[in-house]
Structure formats: structure tokens, C-alpha cells
Amino acid sequence: MALAFDEFGRPFIILREQDQKTRLRGIDAQKANIAAGKAVARILRSSLGPKGMDKMLQGPDGDITITNDGATILEQMDVDNQIAKLMVELSRSQDYEIGDGTTGVVVMAGALLEQAERQLDRGIHPIRIAEGYEMASRVAVEHLERIAQKFEFDVNNYEPLVQTCMTTLSSKIVNRCKRSLAEIAVKAVLAVADLERRDVNLDLIKVEGKVGGKLEDTELIYGILIDKDMSHPQMPKQIEDAHIAILTCPFEPPKPKTKHKVDIDTVEKFETLRKQEQQYFDEMVQKCKDVGATLVICQWGFDDEANHLLMHRNLPAVRWVGGVELELIAIATGGRIVPRFQELTPEKLGKAGVVREKSFGTTKERMLYIEHCANSKAVTVFIRGGNKMMIEETKRSIHDALCVARNLIRNKSIVYGGGAAEIACSLAVDAAADKYPGVEQYAIRAFAEALDSVPMALAENSGLQPIETLSAVKSQQIKENIPFYGIDCNDVGTNDMREQNVFETLIGKQQQILLATQVVKMILKIDDVISNSEY
């Protein structure tokens, strides 16, 4: 415990239990923080680009995840260090805001930290480095605006959207089907998009998966798919022109909410009670038929006797449907969710062209398709695959593609990928450094060098000579003054990203630079780390 004394000689505590805490100050704290950030970036660096490696992660309960999605890798890593946790948050915020570029943003932050360490070794103050980085990031973002290209698309001509989504999917495990998956993602987004307001609600796109079949069997359903079947095996498997009652109330006789009990001591009394319950449920079924319902979808269950009665009355039903699915069914069919049975009216019924039950494989697993709905602004992407891991990774890939398509609808500007945008920004930032007379000039040049880390990592992961490849592409960009030359990762034979159709969204690339700069500035400003000792 550290004690100090005031002017009257009275002791007071500055730092409680100091002997049980470890403390790093000044340059040591900054070096330790930078080392932690670089360690996280090093893990993800090999996952960048179309030839990036996958990581296998084992959870505490033995579940295995195989992925190269930056956000997922960091999410599932058991990180203790607080600076490493900041890098995890950085990746998560990129995923939340943009949906893509989660690996690139961490690699960029790691490179900025590495360059900052060199500047600290030269004796430059961390605040001056942070200010230099801020200036450089502004130059880079403005340059991206200048080299960005706008493109037009509509519901009938969406090829540019597909090409951009294919760039996103090319680094995933599903890249052999990237064309078909990109088309599915774009069609799904356009189906739910409000093109006038240029807004997309991704909650209206449900992504379902079922083990079996192959990746090529993945399909887009203009409607809702639920992992349920009809409550009775003898109910019809297909209903044309369905009128759907969507219930969140129990579809059974009500339970009395009192502490009273009924004593039944004779067979006649039991028979009377059973008949009363049956009559009550009979009336409920009749009410559904009277309002015109041809299918009941219920959030709760009902017993076998009720199920049998529904089958006899020719009223198909589905039970134990989740709340999120009910909401999507209501949106798709134009129906209203009925919380109290007495409120069921014909106006609250949803309408669907066809509701069908489909079996999969030899295990007779069934799912319910609700298609040709009154309101098509709710769709389902149904993924097939050889195993659960493949389906989970495909879901993550589809999520990235959906986010990219949404971002392009919001902002139609694109930049060229393959490291072309980073190289162009690096050259622009390097040229701008001469305009700043102060010490910040060194930090701005360091920022330009850090931008080169992304194309370097792309070249390295593709099995190319990173330094040779980068210098060749840089000189090509300077010589021809064209910012579209990048790293030829797929060995096509041309560095021109326009010919390779490698696009990225402008806002995704800008967000990467801004978020990485913010986190690095935050880390550089920490000069004192007090943590509990391990002993």
C-alpha cells in the first residue's frame, strides 16, 4: 500500500494494495500495448485475401469452427489482454457497420502500430504520431473519394452488385460457388430493398440451413421457410391459396387462474369435464373455420386429442413456431399476429399462394415452405451443405455478401480491390507528407508505409514475392497514373482490377481506414497500465 502524508502529517492511501498490482509506465506501457495489438493482427494476417488461410477454433464445449472471417475468429478467441480486446471490438464494429473487411481492418491497425513503434524508437512523442496519423487518414479518405467510381443499377440490371459480392465471396471457403451465391444475395437484397429511400432492412432476409445435398442446391425462396412440419402426419402436405391464422395464444381450453380445484370422484363427472373441454376446443376450431382460416400457425403447442380433432375437422396446423418466425410470416403474408383468441377476425388472416411440406434425405426430416405471399418483402436463403461446419461458414459468407449489396444500394460508389485502393492512397499520403513541416511528417510517411501492409499481405498469402510484387505495382500506378492496378492474387496475368472485376465498396474501405486510425490513436495515448498481479 502506498502512503502519502498531507500538510498536517496525516497519512492517506494513494494506491491500495500496491504490492499486489503490476504497473507499466511511459514507453514500456506503449511498447507492451503495441506488442499485444500486433500479436492479434499477426494471427489474422494470413487469412487476408482470396488465397488466405482458414483457422480452426475449438470452443470450450468441443465445438469446432473453421472460418477465415476476421470477426468470427476474434469473437471465438479467448482473449485476456485488454488491448487485444480492443482489436476484437474493432473487428466487431467493422462487421456491425459494414459487414465486410473485418480481417483487413485489423491487419491495417497492426501495421499502424508497428510503424508507430518505429517512430517511438526515433524519439517522436506518441501524441505527435497520433496527430500525424489523423492528418494522413483524412488525406487517404479524401483520395478514396477522388478515385471512386459510381455505377448505376436497377432491378433488371444488377451485374455490378453481383461482381462486388463475388469479390467478397472469393476469399471464403465457398468461392467455387461464388457466382450463384452472389446472385442469390443480390436478389434477396433487391427483393426487400426500398430503392426510393435507398434503404435495406436485412432482418427481412432469413438465412436457414439444412445438412445434406450440396452447396449448389442453395436456393432463394420468395417467402418464409420454417423448420417445422404439420402437427399430424395425415394432414395435407400442400395447401393452395392458404389463409393463415397466426396465433400467439394457447390453442387449447384455458387454465383457470385461481387456486380452486375441482374434485372428480366419479366416472360421470370426469366424462362431463372431458366433454366440456372437447366442446370448448370444438368451438375454437369452428371459430377458425368461420373466419376462413385454412391453416393455423401457433406459437404454443396443443395436446394429441386436440391435434386429432384438428385433423378430423380438416384444419391443418403447425405448432411450436418461434416468435421471430411468426413475425416474418406475418410480414410476408400480410397477416396480423393474434394474441387473444377472441380477437381473431377475417381481416387478421395472412395470405399465401402455396404452403407445402417438403421432406429431405432418407431421415424424413421436413420443413415448411410458405411461398407466393401477399407481400414478397420477406425472403429466405436456404443453404445446403455436406456438414454443419460448411453450412455455418456459408451463412457467414452470405451475411457478408448481403451487407455489401446493402451498402452499395445506400452508396453507389466503388473502389477497386486487390490492394489497388491502398496503394493509391499510400502514394497520395506520401506525396502529402511534404506539405507538413512539423514532426507529424514522419508519422504521415509511416501511415503511407502501413497502408502498403494490405497489398503486401495479399501478395504473401498468394505465394508471390511480396516486396517485388508491391514495388512493381506501385511503379506501374505512378508511371501510368492509373489507380486501378493491384495484386494479381489469382494469377490471371493482368494487374488491372477493372479487367478482373475486383470491386469493393467505397464506404467499407473508408470505414476500415477511419476505424483502424481511431483505435491506434487510442492505444498510443495510453501511458500507464495498472493491472492485478498474477500472484
Swiss-Prot record:
It is found in: Cytoplasm. One of its GO terms (cellular component) is nucleus. The keyword tRNA processing does not apply. One of its GO terms (molecular function) is unfolded protein binding. InterPro entries: Chap_CCT_epsi, Chaperone_TCP-1, Chaperonin_TCP-1_CS, Cpn60/GroEL/TCP-1, GroEL-like_apical_dom_sf, GROEL-like_equatorial_sf, TCP-1-like_intermed_sf, TCP-1_chaperonin. Its main location: cytoplasm. Belongs to the TCP-1 chaperonin family. Heterooligomeric complex of about 850 to 900 kDa that forms two stacked rings, 12 to 16 nm in diameter. Molecular chaperone; assists the folding of proteins upon ATP hydrolysis. Known to play a role, in vitro, in the folding of actin and tubulin. This is T-complex protein 1 subunit epsilon.
